[in-house]
Structure formats: C-alpha cells, structure tokens
C-alpha cells in the first residue's frame, strides 16, 4: 500500500496480485487462474500473428478485456470509496536534515576515509564522496578527505573475513558500503570480526527486477501483467515460447544472471529461485534451502541460465552489442538486474569491464523493468564503519560523519540523482521516465537473514548449472618471459589456473589444452588433459598443467578454431560449454600457414547459432592481441578479460571462472 507521502513500506506478506487487494482464495487456485490467463494470452498472440484476418477482432477483444480488467481493478481497489488508512507499522516519512559542514576546514594532514563500494553502486558512492569533499569538514580538528574505492561485493566479503591480507593497513577501507546487507551477513558468517553488530545505515535503495527488451516483454504480455518467479523460470525452460508467440527468430528464452557469489542481483535471483521452489519468497528458511526437493527444483531452474557473469554491466554490454548488430534478443531475453542498471542501459551507458563507462546513443530496444507478482528483493546499500584494528578513532569518527552526510537533504538528492530511490522510496522524475520504473511498486521484500544467506551461498555450487570447460593456454616462446624474480608468465599462469580449478566441483567437466607451433608447422602439444569430470580427474589435470613447457610460435587462430569445434561436438543444453583462452601474443605461424582471422570468426559465429561454445578470452601481458581476443569473445557471446598487467592474472582469472 502506498502511504500519503508516497513511501512504500517493505512488504513481508505473501504474493500479491497485479491489481488491488486479492479475493480470498487459496494460493493454488490463484496460481491456476494466472496460468490459464497466461495460456489464453499466448493463444491470442499466436492467433494474431498467424491469422491476419482476425487481427482487428483480436485487438478489439484485447481492448475490451483490458477495459474490463481495469474496471475490475478500480472496483477492487475501492476507487469510489474513502481512502484506506495507512498501515499502522509503516514508518513516517523522513524529513531529511540539512548538511552541517564545518565553518572552516580542519588542519592538515587530513584524515583519509576509504569507502569501499560495490561495482553496482560505485557511481553513487563516488558522487556522495564528491559532495562531502566539496564542503569544509573538521573531525577532531583535522580536515577530512573521502576516497571511494570499489570491489565486487562477494570478493570484498571474503577479503574482509580474512582481514584484507592483500592490502596494507593504510589501504584497507574505513567504511564498507556494499549494495545489500546480505554481504555483511556473509562476511560475518565467514568469520569477519570487523563488521559491527549494530544495524547498518541504509543510504538508498534499488529494487532487483527482471529486465527485458521492450518487444520481448510485450510479446508475452509481461509488460502488462507481471509474471510470478515460477512463471519466469518456466518460461526460461520453454524451448518454443518465442516461436509460439510468433517470433521464432528470437530463438530460445535466454535468461541472464550474475553470479550469486559476487553480485547482489545474482544473490536475489537465487533467493527467488529457492523461494519459488519452497512456495513463497518471504518464507524462505535455511531448512527449506537444505530440502532435497527444493534444491532439485532450483537445479532445474538453473538449467535455463545461459551463463553467469560477475556484474550486471557485463550482460548489458553484450546486449547492446547484439542490438547494434541486429537485436538484443540475439543475446538475451531477460536479465535479473537492479533498477539503476536499467536506467544506465536505457540512457546509453554501458561498461565492458564494470569500471570504464562509455556513453553512446540510447538503444532502440529499451529495457522494461518487470516487478514479479510474488515479490522482488530490494538492495538497501548499507553503510558501516568497520571495527578493524586498522581503523583509528579519528577515521571512525570521520567515516561516521560521511554516513551522516549521506542521509542529509543534500546527500539524498545525490542518491536520487544517481538513479537510486531515497530513504523515502522516492525517485528522480527523469530516472523514472528513462528507466520506465514503477514509482511505487507493490511487493518489495527485504533480503533474508544471515542463516539463509549463508545456506544459499553454500548451496550454490551444488545447484548451479554444470560447466564443460576447456582451458586453452598459449605456450609459445614468449611465455618464458619473467614477470618477477621468481616467476615467468608460464609459471604464473600455471599457478593461476590451479587456483581457479578450486571453483569447479564434482559434476563439472574440465580439460586442458595448450598450443605452440613446432618447427615442422604442427600445433603442439594440443590436448593434455581430456575434458572430464573434475571430481575424478583433478590430480591428472594438475599433473598435465605442471608439465606444460613453452615451445615455438603462436598458432592462435588455429587453436581457437580447433578446440571450439571440439567442444561443440559434445555441446549440451544442460551445461555451460566454454573455452577459456589465455594468450600473451599475436597469431604468428611462420612454419606453416593456418586458418586466418576472418574464417576463424565466421566459424565461431556459425557454432554460436547451433551449438554455442562460449570462448572467454584473457589478454595476458602487454603484447597480447587485445583487439583479436575481444573479437573472439564477442563472436561467441562470451566476455573478454584484461590481464595485460600479468601480476593481476590470479585475480582476473578468479573473476572469470565465476561465469560458471
């Protein structure tokens, strides 16, 4: 229910329908009614696309039906009745206080406050830092400078649990501001002692929605009548949905998700899947997560996932590339993201790496945010001053002052300007228009508690879509180049791959191949560990990895063409089939001619439309052929990763394998 001030309280009840208050019926009956309406809608769509002579009639019937539904909605909402009383426990709207900067900045040296955000809310946090730094501040007689930094939420949670061992004390964050409190829960569950027990301070919200290109949402009526999460997962598993709707050119239903191990939208997708399987999103418990029947249904949901990505920006960048070369539907049908990401996409802002943002003309096919009928989670962007031994009293006080500023009239204006809802649930009017957001959506749900968060995190490796992955490593002579006193490119690559292997579990099929060109023109050594269940072949894989040696030149095009085709031969819709390519140079085959780049890319494109093999590319070192590696990944709908600074290989490869 919307309050008089426009605030929508977080809902904790079970699913609500699309209009007004529901009639008193048992949930199964309501679901059955929805199912029948959906079937009727799809039949109308199919008839409209197949029988031209009935188009006008069907349109008229649809119009009349819409009017009837609208009238029913008005009646159920009590349009003619007195306004309903507000919910008794709904909070009063917040009257945001004015900022209170110091009259004169404190003395130097300034207290430096490092604020670690997620990738998703980094722009908002940077804007808040700029606003705070623009006015004089004085804490304990010292000036203050806020430095925003970012990391993926799951990575930050794990690092915090370990005490940020890879950062010097002066580089560790004073304030942590992930985009959802689930990461605070996860860090605590993993042993973090620096997360204070007090309730964190939310600085703004963004709902996690199902976003679809407008034409696709309209074709199945979801822009008008939002589906339940079960209907979303059912649609994703329906191979003929688009053909039945008159659009066979859109192929299968492609559902995009971020990895729940690192991104909030991925977490929300998993909570929705477990909740839908258990019968209710707001009744999910650690016990229901552990239920074999529930886990089995979630595992079935995950089969419809094309692959996972680390951030929403990764998916949306690919969607924009697909639209520019044809249609966004070639890459995705729907993706689970936050509202702010929809706003960015619709105004022409994309990011290939989640950090560097580019602005181009807005897309022709705008995304439509859909708020599922049985509820959606809300990212609350909580801020906490960390209680680590690296945070002194002055830094803690300055961090608390920054959090105070975020809740002021000036800070909340920045929150709205940055594409988020303020603490009263209000959006900037321009954001609402561009992103097509619902100003006051019904069905908002808080994220689950720590026990559920930890249970879902632990369950994900067992329910995720299984992977079939071939690591393909360039072992040309340049891989012997040193990157430190104790490591060469090749030895560092071996260590990074061995660490990345920990991501895979029994049931994943993983193999290893390498390529160089020998003096006789042969590509060697080729496959050294067949693609097989890593649960039983891990030791053999590691042995083959340790035995790799550099040799000859770089048959890059031949290697990609050969091993992508090999992976395609065993493609299955029940697995994420991929090649992970690591290369430090350019195609160089002086001893024998091989396939050229144009033919290789054409072959990859052909595979992508039949037996899609994702070729993730990783540029390793300053001499890597970045442009070619980017074109390879783009041709297959996969992602390019940058390790041109070879010392960052472990982190980059660790990021890459979250795609599986």
Model-derived regions: residue spans:
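Bilobed periplasmic-binding protein/Venus flytrap-like ligand-binding cleft at the lobe interface
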Residues: 225-238, 254-261, 273, 382-420, ...
